[in-house]
């Protein structure tokens, strides 16, 4: 997989989204609440004690919800305006589920979409504007919208910074579980990541901590189930060089371009798989790694594919991986003296990780990444995505503060 590099902005920016339809007035069912100050994220060495998850109330949704028709199965979605979350909302609506979508009042790249655009984009879901980092606010804002049968959490920290990872990937995700259980949810689908198998980064540790919370809740209450979805790579994270190569520049990669590989999956296919987790009892209480169709591709193969689609001879720039190691060493040293540099050091480690670690399932017997052990799903291919970006550009697939080369 191509390396994830720092953008020119180290501060958090809003996640990307596709262009919204024409704005319309917010309907009466939309809930607004002023965002409270977000709690501080976890610091290294701080213990994290999860608040106990309240059991669902007596008037909760019926537990055997899988016997109900989709039109009778209400699903809560947090992270609904994110890259994957908005496709999950659309897929659930397409299948006939009533959807309660928790959103930020402003979404899209650098918050360019206001509340009206958010409501229009997620229609006909019931949109609830709330602060997922504030447990009390989230529960209060959602209280009029129960009961629900299942929940899908698509939350993710925007850049993977140390405190932001614990604030969002763990704490806000825990708040989603607490609120969902309070409204009667009997199943919880977590959008995690395949890279948590080898946790060297703060956001991976935060995600793993919450995965443990889900397992503990299922152990405490046998009527509750979960599905942990661990996708490989997203198409948009591999499309950052299409425009530059199209404009005549070489394709940039680390080492020989064979340090890592991935089986990328489209947002539509991943959303369909996540929706399957609600209705398919065979996916309950399981960790589900998932990739797209076809064989795993190295950065070298991705570059060769791109040049072939453009009808050009391949031209590559091969960057020694040691360049990143040196930068990380310097940033780590600075972070010990200047705490404000801590996130910059973490971002460097994220880039190094994605430059050298495959987004595939780890074979427990060999300790190696395995293409064969990584399940495939869907029909959308990276080649089709590249063809579309060559024709139409990256509109709706902007990378925000996470930029590939």
Curated annotation (Swiss-Prot):
Pathway: Porphyrin-containing compound metabolism; chlorophyll biosynthesis. Residues 1-58 form a transit peptide. Keywords: Chlorophyll biosynthesis, Chloroplast, NADP, Oxidoreductase, Plastid, Transit peptide. It comes from the Eukaryota. Optimum pH is 7.0 with DV-Chlidea or DV-Pchlidea as substrate, optimum pH is 6.5 with DV-Chla, DV-MPE or DV-Mg-Proto as substrate. GO terms for biological process: chlorophyll biosynthetic process. It is found in: Plastid, Chloroplast. SUPFAM superfamilies: NAD(P)-binding Rossmann-fold domains. It catalyses: protochlorophyllide a + NADP(+) = 3,8-divinyl protochlorophyllide a + NADPH + H(+). One of its GO terms (molecular function) is 3,8-divinyl protochlorophyllide a 8-vinyl-reductase (NADPH) activity. One of its GO terms (cellular component) is chloroplast. Its EC number is 1.3.1.75. Optimum temperature is 25 degrees Celsius with DV-Chlidea or DV-Chla as substrate, Optimum temperature is 20 degrees Celsius with DV-Pchlidea, DV-MPE or DV-Mg-Proto as substrate. The keyword Cytoplasm does not apply. Catalyzes the conversion of divinyl chlorophyllide to monovinyl chlorophyllide. Reduces the 8-vinyl group of the tetrapyrrole to an ethyl group using NADPH as the reductant. Can use (3,8-divinyl)-chlorophyllide a (DV-Chlidea) > (3,8-divinyl)-chlorophyll a (DV-Chla) > (3,8-divinyl)-protochlorophyllide a (DV-Pchlidea) > (3,8-divinyl)-magnesium-protoporphyrin IX monomethyl ester (DV-MPE) > (3,8-divinyl)-magnesium-protoporphyrin IX (DV-Mg-Proto) as substrates. This is Divinyl chlorophyllide a 8-vinyl-reductase, chloroplastic. The gene is DVR.
